[in-house]
UniProtKB/Swiss-Prot annotation:
It holds the Pfam family Ribosomal_L27. The keyword Ribonucleoprotein applies. It comes from Pectobacterium carotovorum subsp. carotovorum (strain PC1). GO terms for cellular component: cytosolic large ribosomal subunit. Residues 1-21 are annotated as: Disordered. It comes from the Bacteria. Keywords: Ribonucleoprotein, Ribosomal protein. Belongs to the bacterial ribosomal protein bL27 family. NCBIfam families: L27. One of its GO terms (biological process) is translation. The gene is rpmA. The keyword Mitochondrion does not apply. This is Large ribosomal subunit protein bL27.
Amino acid sequence: MAHKKAGGSTRNGRDSNAQRLGVKRFGGESVLAGNIIVRQRGTKFHAGTNVGCGKDHTLFALTDGKVQFEVKGPKNRKYISIVAE
């Protein structure tokens, strides 16, 4: 008779859920106050005018308007602002 011994247990077989980070509203898009613009880890993007920053560095609109991306400053930082339509 053919016999097969029990296979050993494995230490694999786990995976974490995706964090769903990234830009949610792109340049030129209309947003309402409270809309999330970017979900990020750290400050890849910085808050400009009419944009708030949450404790997890999520950027969100403080007023209604259009999203505007800009690069400025000596360190070429990326800022996101909301401009009135």
